[in-house]
Amino acid sequence: MPQYNDSVRSSDKQNWSASRISTYRQCPLKYYYTYVKKWRCSKAPDTTAADKGTCFHETVEHFKTGMEHAKLYEILESKIKEYNVDTTKYDEKAALERFFLFWNEFVAKSELTGFKTLQEGWASGDLGGEHFIGALDLCLDRGDRIKIFDYKSGKTPSISKYKDQLLLYSYLKGQERGWDFQQISDNVKLYLFFPMSEQKTAVTDEDKMLASVKEIKYDATVLQDCINNYLETIQEIKAHDWENEDLDALGCPDFACCWCEHKGGNPNAEGYKGCKASRDLGNVQERYVTYHLKESK
């Protein structure tokens, strides 16, 4: 997976990302614990669901047109062991087979028309003076045209919750060329690929692959509105007086709480306030679990 290194920027210039913004929009309390005070939990989070996606990503990032498929299967086997993926529950091999079909259709054919392929790269740029970064699973670039693909490991292909993330990427890549909103919407295409999605109506493997790829349609107005919303969210975050916030009122429990390390967390003497919203719903953290501040580098 890519490691971002931006040593040129001063240390007081914080990086923003789609995930950081979505964390705040989803739950301001989790944002506070993750980005403001950086509280960490002694209990290792359950990453079972995420590991299947990581296993896939860290396998396919090695692929290039013309590479023997057998080599990628070898990498997949090692990644399955590394992440202890339950292959009876998550069919990584079937996902890889679908990936090969995807690559032939969307990547290899594009390369024949002049597109250059970049896997696991970065997009970065400024939005209203705020520095944003984003990790790109796959970017096809011809200079005058760009295609961005993001891999998702969900069973159901859904565009809505990832749309803002991909729109941000399109803006950052277009900004590198000095394109305006109209030029970006004309020249940057956005796609989501769901290699593990269930396709019950598609007949052939090719059909299932095609049904697993979703294009995000947008125009200049949609893109501009999205970027403005990002900037408005940042201003809202900066307007918080975090040191004097009523943290009990910040929690926003929803389905995502099941993956949150702060679910059911109790206050401690070190200043950790826990999550009252999740405790009120009956969630209780185990007694042995503790919370501590992440050490500053």
Region locations from a protein language model:
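RecB-family 4Fe-4S metal-dependent nuclease core
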Residues: 1-297
